Regions:
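Nucleotidyltransferase catalytic core that binds NTPs
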Residues: 3-6, 13-221
């Protein structure tokens, strides 16, 4: 049987065929990323065009995409609870992780404590994180948001980078803004401060013991 098509009907047929073909390609791509045979590194997407295409594929499959950003240095239970809550707003959670260079700019020259590669791998091992991308120093606060155009953008109320009113301004790129309070009783900054204090106390004790030992040796000579 020969299918006769002409004019507008022929164009519509090929458009529909292309759409269906793309749909099945998206399914294959998603299985490669999230299926049983996938590995952690397939869920780390640094190429912006690939990230954009992946998000478009997810949305075509009817999935609700959630985006959040942060350093995730010295990951603790507050981070895990925050990411779990963020994931509850949709089907796929994308985490944009600040690079080492960006973290130094934002947090100071002694940060991060944990290097970028390790922070990324820790996040990829968390069950509520689906995709991870790196936010580089040249990226503005809204660059990743504008690229991904998430259905839901999640901010932490503890962030110093953006006020709640400024956060609402990003609604032009996404469907909804959610601002979450801290989900734990500790913070990375507090932990770093405690480690610094403990380190200083230990060093002071060791120096004191060395001085005492040195003075005792002088007295005995």
């Amino acid at each position: 049987m020969q299918l006769l098509m002409c004019g507008h009907n022929e164009e519509s047929f090929y458009l529909e065929y292309s759409r269906i073909n793309q749909f099945f390609l998206h399914i294959v791509n998603m299985n490669d990323t999230f299926g049983p045979g996938s590995n952690l590194q397939k869920r780390l997407i640094n190429d912006q065009e690939k990230l954009k295409a992946t998000v478009e594929s997810l949305k075509m499959l009817g999935m609700k995409v959630v985006l959040t950003q942060g350093v995730y240095d010295l990951i603790h239970e507050g981070h895990a609870a925050y990411l779990e809550k963020a994931r509850s707003y949709g089907d796929i959670l994308i985490v944009a992780v600040d690079s080492d260079e960006l973290t130094k700019i934002r947090k100071g020259p002694k940060r991060p404590i944990v290097p970028q590669a390790e922070r990324v791998n820790m996040l990829l091992h968390l069950r509520h994180v689906d995709l991870v991308t790196i936010k580089e120093a040249q990226h503005g606060l809204g660059d990743i948001i504008a690229l991904v155009k998430p259905d839901v953008m999640v901010f932490s109320s503890s962030t110093t980078d953006v006020t709640p009113d400024e956060a609402k301004g990003y609604e032009q790129y996404c469907g909804k803004i959610e601002i979450l309070p801290p989900q734990g009783t500790t913070s990375t900054t507090a932990r770093v401060r405690n480690l610094t204090i403990e380190g200083a106390e230990t060093l002071a004790k060791e120096v004191s013991e060395l001085i005492t030992k040195f003075l005792d040796q002088i007295k005995a000579s």
